[in-house]
Amino acid sequence: MVAPTFNLPGWVNWIAQDADGAWWGYSAEPHQHDRGWYENEVGDCVLLGREAPAPRWRETLQSIQH
């Protein structure tokens, strides 16, 4: 899956879309829960934007190459 183009903060190393269509950026690899992703205990996150919900949202996790 190809993610939309976002203006990412420099600290964002991972992006993923939740089941509701929200795209999030994470500083550390996030964990998956039943309807989306959440930051691990050492990371930060930021809401990047929203799109139509993706049926295959579990496949949206991507590392960002800086």
Language model features with spans:
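Short, surface-exposed beta-edge/turn micro-motifs
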Residues: G10-W14, D20-W23
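Low-complexity intrinsically disordered segments
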Residues: N40-H66
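Short, surface-exposed terminal/edge motifs of secreted or surface/virion proteins that either
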Residues: G21-G36
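Surface-exposed ligand/attachment interfaces on beta-rich extracellular proteins
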Residues: M1-F6
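A generic alpha-helix propensity feature with a strong bias for hydrophobic helices
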Residues: N7, V12, H33, R56-R58
